[in-house]
Swiss-Prot record:
Protein name: Probable translation initiation factor IF-2
Gene: infB
Pfam families tied to this protein: GTP_EFTU, GTP_EFTU_D4, IF-2
UniProt region (G5), positions on chain: 206-208
Family: Belongs to the TRAFAC class translation factor GTPase superfamily. Classic translation factor GTPase family. IF-2 subfamily.
Taxonomic lineage from the root: Archaea, Methanobacteriati, Thermoplasmatota, Thermoplasmata, Thermoplasmatales
Amino acid sequence: METKSSTSLPAKKLRQPIVCVLGHVDHGKTTLLDIIRGTAVANKEPGGITQRIAATTVDINKILKATEKLNNKGMKIPGLLFIDTPGHVAFSNMRARGGALADIAVLVIDINEGIMPQTVESIDILKKFKTPFIIAANKIDLIPFFTDVKTNLFTEFIRKQRQEYVNELDARIYNIVNKLYEYGLNSDRFDRISDFTKTIAIVPVSAKKNIGVPEILMVLAGLAQRFLESEIEYKDINGHATIIEVRREESAGIALDAVLYQGTISVGDTVAVNTKTGPVTTKVKALFVNTGKSQRSLKEVETVSAAEGIRVLISDKLDVISGSPLIVVKGNMEQVMKEIEEASKVDIPLDENGIYVKAEAIGSLEAISYELNKQGIKIRAAAVGDITKRDVMDVQTLQDPLNRIIIGFNVSILPEAKDAIESSDVGVITGDIIYKIVEDTQKWIEERKKQLSQKRKEAMPVPAKIRILPQYIFRASKPVIVGIRVETGQIKVGDNLIRSDGKYAGTIKSIRNDEVSVRYQDAPAEVAVAIDNVTLNRQIFPDDVLYVDIPESVVKELRKAPMEKEIMDTLEEIIKIKRKENPFWGTKV
């Protein structure tokens, strides 16, 4: 770690644009970031203060050198600040005054796999925050007919490829173009675009072979400078940052990795942060930035100006929430605390008839809730933090069993909560991939519906329709024994039957399926039944259609129950039969 120094306010009008990288798992986000940074991230770092801040600056000199063979004249930005926490959920957690922290984004797509579930989630998030982005079409080295060329420039690389390779590349690019068009987005290869305000740039790259990265830097810098000048104008105000990771260092206490996106922060400043108990103030004990010499080297500084990735050591052991703001207080305490409170509000539509959601940060909470809502899954309550015993107890009391589930995104289940879950019927789904959690939640709901449907069938008469099979008449009375086809619903021993005119048609005494006695039978099936209290060819006849008699007292409940359409249609047929005699049948509470 180097000795203390001070970074002065930038003389330039523009600050560094903040760039976030998103994409589907295994499409090459981390490898691309490693190439851009010019260094690989260490798998494990020694104790003490972790020697890495989750944001990296690529200064203008490095960009100019990488793009010197391209038309890089007139660059005014001081560099690019890349967020080293890739992914659409991390993007959601990075806020700046209600909008996205990132000024621009890179969406990484495996050119051979195309658009995948997490790609779609990333597109949705980018559209939601109205964040401009480019596409890095990665893994062009895996396309057939690839020829290795010693150059980092895509424009040089493509000129030295066989026509077969060029054709294969274009086919894959236009597959992405066509898919993006389905999401309302126009796109094309970057060197074929005349108006970048209307068309998303696709830059073919190979992170593995280090091809196309200069073009990515060139396009990012050009777009930011040309179209985002007002957003990246430096403002000399009290420091505003977004916390992207909270570290509890044994040797140093609480360390906050953050992105300073406006203003200045200094050692000794009073800063406001949000905790699980609300906004509080604390003192800046020390500040660190990356040295730029290596990914594991930090420099301690007295002052930092935007935009920069910083590590802030604070003087108090606070339960700070990741994704929340950090604001320097300069005699404006009330205003800052209000700003912290407003920025920390969860923007999720809630519904009493919904489920519980927990996540590690506000943005994650909104991201998972957004995807659940898209699938018609309503949210009753959403909160930051691990799953607790209190959460389980609250969910257990919900009236609707379909809502007795807790979704946990990037959180743990506390030991006391695990014990409570085991003794309850509360479902818990946890994970760190949104689309997988959504899929698992949908499966859980469908399975719970089936369980509830079966319980209801066992507890009360189920609307059912049967037909007597004239070729299977075994006994005419005491009891009638006939073969029947269960056409809809479920019949049970003890069910009363009615005819299509509403007249009583006996009571099911027993059911046999392949010589085995059963208590109930679901449709569709052909079984033998014994029917008490009727005589064949008097009250019932071969080829008759009969219905299970439904008590009027359960009609309203059955109409609200989650049952198959065929069963609900049969219930309506029974109601129609009953109302021939009583027009108001089934309307009582």
